């Protein structure tokens, strides 16, 4: 029997100033989270103008969480992208969050490694929300503050080991190809 650890967290924040988000805020949140995580978890980014130069890349906590290294496919002579062990759901966010308002979004962590780094992930969100999300966030003051990082769902997935596995994803993702 295999176990896959999946947990969904509700991240609530309070705006200290007006926040303008794009219509699809997921990529803005992902970018803010990635920058904050790199600043606190990558040992080489601060010395290389924000670029991760860790070698091997698997040794970098930032890369393992946010930008996993490609892996060689078994029985094939090519590399395959590896999805990061998280999903950000921003469908609940409005495009405007006014100063003093609270808002929330969700983050789902997948796998034991991501769960073992939950404290680092929470710290990265705290920093990302303070530095700013969305447009116009370079004011020098904390744009918003983390109110809570709460577990809201932890499904129990158990299955027998098999050669065939079918996974169906339901996503709020907005997929574009060449800008369309």
Q: Which residue ranges define each predicted feature?
A:
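RNA-interacting cores
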Residues: 1-180
């Amino acid at each position: 029997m295999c176990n896959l650890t999946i947990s969904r967290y509700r991240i609530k924040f309070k705006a200290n100033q007006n926040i303008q988000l794009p219509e699809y805020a997921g990529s803005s949140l992902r970018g803010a989270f990635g920058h904050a995580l790199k600043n606190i978890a990558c040992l080489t980014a601060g010395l290389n103008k924000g670029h991760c130069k860790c070698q091997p890349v698997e040794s970098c906590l930032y890369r393992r969480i946010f930008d996993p290294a490609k892996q060689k496919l078994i029985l094939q002579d090519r590399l395959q992208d590896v999805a990061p062990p998280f999903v950000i759901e921003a469908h609940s966010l409005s495009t405007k969050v006014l100063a003093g308002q609270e808002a929330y979004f969700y983050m789902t962590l997948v796998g034991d490694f991501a769960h073992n780094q939950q404290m680092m992930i929470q710290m990265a969100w705290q920093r990302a929300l303070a530095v700013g999300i969305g447009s116009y966030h370079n004011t020098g003051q904390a744009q918003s503050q983390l109110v809570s990082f709460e577990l809201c769902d932890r499904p129990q997935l158990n299955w027998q080991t098999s050669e065939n596995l079918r996974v169906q994803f339901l996503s709020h993702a907005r997929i574009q190809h060449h800008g369309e």
